[in-house]
């Protein structure tokens, strides 16, 4: 394959029974991701997650840092051998509760993020999520043991 795996941290952020996703666009397609991003060399997973949450949804500062649980899941996204570009992303997923926070101030400093939306769990099957973890999002509850979801790829 040739490409070194990339580590991406993200968080299942729940608010009143719904989950917050970030909308991304590439030419000809739209998809949704859990808020998060890449881990820099020398950065802990939780520090990377807090930095990414600040960039993608505006949660910043020590007093505003979101307490997180986890990791709650791990997923491999490995592109098929026949795909144009070899890609392998290891997703390490944490969780947090947005209850008590105003979501009106959710803003992104990340140009790749085209918007945010809270989804009811039943809506998740009707959208493209990268990686395709809709079933996990519908079933996961705080306190569940960490789970390896396997190799999942969404074209």
Which role fits each region the language model picked out?
Residues 29-32, 104-155:
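Nudix hydrolase/Nudix homology domain
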Residues 39-67, 75-129:
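Unchanged
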Residues 38, 74, 83, 134-135, ...:
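A generic alpha-helix propensity feature with a strong bias for hydrophobic helices
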